[in-house]
């Protein structure tokens, strides 16, 4: 993969452009955000339109820690109100949409979940006349296998998975996914609390594909995860922030962008790409088929692809941008981050999730649930044993009292 080289060449070209050209035709929304004037941003003003946006937690610049409030800027510019809520895994996003429990206008699923949703008719085709900023998306990140013609999605960010560890709590840095099965880390390991990412770790460890083709493959890899379970402190998603920043665990697995955020908050933390490889994911913006505000949703997606907006988001969340025009204006530390923009050697070992067959996906869901409940079942058994012992003791005490009373009668 040549993304770093491509972005570097783009930066050189950008330096040759007149500054006046970069600033031409702009509307200033806030001190930090200007947008293209060649777009009708105000056509929904006064129409009481509300967009329901469903995104990952900690995945947009929200005004905290002196960041830009991107949603507030969109509302100010367009007059559209945004009801912004979050999820913590692709699986919970899918379940929420599938159940019909809520109606959303913009969602941000990962590549393999996009493919699944497309196949099930859950996404609405996009009208790119309302998303001219799609031109800002780098060619390298268009037409992915999960959405071959970008008919349904616009890339938002990219990320990889790896190991984050506390340098004060480990004797030497982990180098392999297999290190997460080392008993020296017992009780100090944080694992993904979603089946697909956790499965990938077991697959890397066992030399299997992260995209299983048979139920037998699933069973074999989940057995690896089951063997690891006694060593795991907790299965987490966003909870990892507090635990790693607060030095409550020695090692954890998570996404590259969030690792940058955690390391910024705790300098004792460090990151490693395991030697077996890593998963590269593309998270994309999409519109559910049930949305009643398609055009306004497309306006939101177009806004998110504005360079200043992209810069604000990427600098806040630390993820990899799919837009060269955003990379060009990033702060230097992030622009050249080896976590966000890994070397060619690491990129060569990147694997990409693909949609699983219904049979394999069902098997993974079942085996993951069984693995997660394994200790819970044991704990439940111990609870019943304890309860039985308490009842037996109570019965024994009652028997003693009755026996004593009987003796006294004679």
PLM regions: where:
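Mature extracytoplasmic/periplasmic domains
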Residues: 288-349, 390-393
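Early extracytoplasmic/lumenal segment of secretory-pathway proteins
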Residues: 23-116
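Conserved C-terminal helix/tail region of periplasmic/extracytoplasmic solute-binding proteins
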Residues: 344-410
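Ligand-binding "clamshell"
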Residues: 118-125, 145-150, 262-273, 333-338
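Extracytoplasmic ligand-binding site segments that recognize negatively charged/polar headgroups
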Residues: 52-67, 88, 102-248
């Amino acid at each position: 993969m040549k993304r770093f080289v491509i972005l570097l060449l783009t930066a050189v070209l950008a330096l040759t452009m007149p500054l006046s050209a970069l600033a031409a035709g702009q509307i200033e929304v806030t001190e930090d955000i200007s947008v293209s004037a060649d777009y009708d941003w105000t056509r929904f003003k006064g129409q009481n339109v509300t967009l329901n946006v469903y995104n990952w937690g900690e995945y947009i610049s929200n005004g905290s820690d002196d960041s830009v409030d991107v949603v507030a800027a969109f509302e100010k510019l367009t007059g559209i109100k945004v009801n912004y809520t979050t999820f913590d895994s692709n699986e919970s996003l899918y379940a929420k949409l599938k159940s019909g429990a809520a109606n959303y206008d913009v969602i941000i699923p990962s590549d393999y979940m996009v493919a699944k949703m497309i196949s099930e008719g859950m996404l609405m085709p996009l009208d790119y006349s309302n998303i001219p900023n799609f031109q800002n998306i780098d060619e390298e990140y268009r037409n992915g296998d999960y959405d071959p013609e970008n008919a349904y999605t616009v890339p938002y960010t990219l990320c990889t998975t790896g190991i984050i560890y506390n340098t004060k709590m480990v004797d030497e840095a982990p180098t392999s996914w297999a290190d997460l099965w080392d008993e020296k880390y017992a009780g100090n390991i944080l694992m993904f609390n979603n089946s697909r990412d956790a499965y990938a770790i077991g697959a890397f460890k066992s030399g299997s594909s992260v995209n299983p083709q048979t139920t037998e493959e699933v069973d074999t890899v989940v057995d690896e995860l089951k063997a690891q379970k006694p060593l795991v402190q907790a299965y987490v998603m966003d909870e990892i922030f507090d635990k790693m920043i607060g030095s409550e665990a020695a090692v954890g697995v998570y996404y590259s962008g969030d690792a940058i955020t955690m390391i910024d908050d705790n300098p004792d933390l460090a990151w490693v790409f395991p030697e077996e490889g890593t998963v590269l994911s593309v998270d994309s913006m999409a519109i559910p088929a049930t949305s009643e505000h398609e055009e306004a949703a497309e306006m939101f997606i177009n806004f998110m692809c504005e360079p200043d907006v992209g810069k604000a988001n990427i600098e806040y969340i630390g993820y990899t941008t799919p837009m060269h025009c955003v990379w060009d204006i990033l702060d230097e530390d992030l622009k050249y981050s080896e976590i966000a923009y890994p070397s060619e050697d690491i990129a060569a070992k990147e694997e990409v999730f693909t949609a699983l067959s219904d049979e394999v996906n069902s098997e993974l869901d079942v085996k993951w649930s069984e693995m997660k409940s394994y200790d819970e079942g044991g704990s439940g058994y111990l609870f019943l044993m304890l309860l039985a012992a308490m009842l037996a003791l109570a019965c024994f005490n009652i028997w003693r009292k009755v026996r004593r009373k009987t003796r006294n009668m004679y």
